[in-house]
């Protein structure tokens, strides 16, 4: 046989075998932590198809946040959830913030109900949502915190996938037991290092351990120069510092929370590795959101340098999404 033809056949066989190994091995990670290569392969599996779908099947995400001081945070979270692929995004915010957010985008569904006397209206909206993000721009007023506790309790009853960020994390640091034993499909917390220390202090005061006190359905992403994901299953934990830059623009965490709301719903719906494993879904969705956000950051920084803002990161969503999922 011609040596060139033989080499070509051998190369084709190796490529085919490599592909088969990828497919068969990506779900075999019972002993060691998930590696980036495996996480990237699993990330591809959560992306839903577009053919033959009706509006809403790619996800309906709710963002609960905003205040008289902060209108950008819930907008960044909501518009990201929409632009990465959720079909519908609802924003529940204060009356003063609602008008501003509506002027930012006609694509978002905005409700001016974030007030204690509207709790019944909020409860009537949550069943529409496939995943709920609580915290962006929420504020820390006592009335607001109590309202958030009531909303979290209602999400528990409805078993809604929950993402807690920013002032939502502050609320938990003041009442750590509010998410204790949260039912499946669970909660993902997304603190930065400062917020993580406050949460750790809250857990310590309750004589609890960092990632076991809340129960097996609560996972944590600690954001820093290197992101770290913690769950109660060691194999699903990971660390990653790919992408990103030294520029920490205000609003970057809100972008991540919105993306995570969408990806969390997708991961839960995809039955990764042929099984409904909540912690695996949380791990892969969080990895995808962290990688995507870091790519938005690095791409925006390459263009804008130190003048980069979260608004510049929004412009890189399409490109970052393609690199994350394709």
Descriptions of predicted regions:
Residues 3-4, 9, 13, 17-161, ...:
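Small-residue (G/A/S/T)-rich helix-start motifs and N-terminal tracts that mark the onset
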